[in-house]
């Protein structure tokens, strides 16, 4: 049996996941993180994107995170997300529309603030579409 640890993924609205996992992948403030059993203690900000959860026995789940905090302790990991949405609950049409609007805003931006905000919106829309795609593949 593979080594595991306990993972909790919670948002302000609800608990999204609680259980034993073999590993997770998430984008931290310094880049991609792979958290395996026995990982050193860590506290870091999470960038908007997805968390890939590899559950016990290799089953995968994908959740979109709008940002938050990741805490790694011996034997347990906690993700405190600003917003968390399961892949199957994301609306592909809305994500595609958000991507299109963000791309238009980037083209018509008139300053650094407009461009930065539109780029952040584009990154979020692309991350949602990626979560949708991976969720469909895993089903």
Curated annotation (Swiss-Prot):
Belongs to the ATPase epsilon chain family. InterPro entries: ATP_F1_dsu/esu_C_sf, ATP_synth_F1_dsu/esu, ATP_synth_F1_dsu/esu_N, ATP_synth_F1_esu_C, ATPsynth_dsu/esu_N. It is found in: Cell inner membrane. Signal peptide: none annotated. GO terms for cellular component: plasma membrane; proton-transporting ATP synthase complex. Its main location: membrane. This is ATP synthase epsilon chain. GO terms for molecular function: ATP binding; proton-transporting ATP synthase activity, rotational mechanism. It is a peripheral membrane protein.
């Amino acid at each position: 049996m593979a080594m595991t640890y306990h993972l909790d993924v919670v948002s302000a609205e609800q608990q999204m996941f609680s259980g034993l996992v073999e590993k997770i992948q998430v984008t931290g403030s310094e880049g991609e993180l792979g958290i395996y059993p026995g990982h050193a203690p860590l506290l870091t900000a999470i960038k908007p994107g997805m968390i890939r959860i590899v559950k016990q026995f290799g089953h995968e789940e994908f959740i979109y995170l709008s940002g938050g905090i990741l805490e790694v302790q011996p034997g347990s990991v906690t993700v405190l997300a600003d917003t968390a949405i399961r892949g199957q609950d994301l609306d592909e049409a809305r994500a595609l529309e958000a991507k299109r609007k963000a791309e238009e805003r980037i083209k018509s931006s008139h300053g650094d603030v407009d461009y930065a905000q539109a780029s952040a919106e584009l990154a979020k829309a692309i991350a949602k579409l990626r979560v949708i795609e991976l969720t469909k593949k895993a089903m």
